[in-house]
């Protein structure tokens, strides 16, 4: 596609602006967490959590922003595909970090061994599946079967984390029961997004 003749479309521009604001917000939030940490492990973990999400998403959102203004090219298409792979892995790490945040927030609770195994096993399996070349991340075809498998395992990881926050409930006055709904919504939206990324061509 000739960049000189490409005319950006308004929906693409609006999406690009939203993506840029989202990444900037995450970046600032992560920096604030680290600045306020003062050696407190919980704040450090929240900073790592935020920057993990921001950093992973940046790998596929930045190419999308470029595509919105310059059109699609083989290089941008490849970067978007690779970015989706990276963000799939970092989103899995996001849930594992939430496990450690739960442990620090509620030291009086012990994670059931079965739930912890469930979280770790599903996270490792998902990352392993994400690394398979058969995913065809950088092609329009993708791999619907592996996409379903990835997101199915991802749902298991999310359910494991939700169980932990349901167990702790409102202990300590943190009102962490709301985390259950937040994680559920995040899991559903993430799953829908990545299924869409397989169904809708990258270019």
Give the positions of each predicted feature.
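Internal transmembrane alpha-helix with an interfacial aromatic "cap," most often the third helix
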Residues: 30, 55-117, 124-138
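Membrane-interfacial loop-to-transmembrane alpha-helix junctions, especially the N-terminal start
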Residues: 39-51, 76-79, 110-118, 175-182, ...
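Alpha-helical membrane segments in multi-pass integral membrane proteins
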Residues: 118-124, 143-199
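Amphipathic alpha-helical packing elements
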Residues: 43-69, 197-203
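Juxtamembrane "helix-exit" motif on the non-cytosolic side of transmembrane helices
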Residues: 33-38, 66-69, 101-106, 129-140, ...
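Membrane-interface interhelical loops and short amphipathic "cap" helices
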Residues: 2-11, 42-43, 66-79, 136-144
């Amino acid at each position: 596609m000739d960049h000189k003749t490409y005319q950006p479309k308004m929906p693409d521009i609006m999406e690009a602006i939203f993506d840029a604001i989202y990444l900037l917000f995450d970046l600032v939030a992560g920096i604030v967490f680290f600045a306020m940490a003062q050696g407190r492990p919980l704040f450090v973990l929240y900073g790592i959590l935020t920057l993990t999400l921001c950093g992973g998403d940046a790998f596929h959102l930045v190419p999308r922003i470029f595509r919105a203004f310059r059109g699609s090219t083989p290089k941008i298409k490849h970067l978007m595909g690779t970015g989706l792979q990276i963000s799939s892995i970092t989103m899995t790490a996001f849930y594992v970090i939430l496990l450690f945040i739960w442990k620090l927030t509620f030291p009086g609770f012990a994670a059931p061994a079965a739930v912890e195994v469930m979280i770790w096993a599903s996270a490792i399996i998902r990352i392993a599946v994400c690394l398979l070349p058969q995913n065809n991340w950088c092609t329009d075809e993708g791999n619907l079967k592996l996409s379903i498998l990835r997101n199915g395992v991802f749902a298991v990881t999310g359910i494991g984390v939700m169980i932990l926050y349901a167990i702790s409930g409102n202990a300590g006055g943190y009102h962490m029961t709301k985390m259950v709904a937040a994680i559920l919504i995040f899991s559903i939206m993430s799953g829908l997004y990545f299924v869409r990324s397989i169904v809708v061509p990258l270019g």
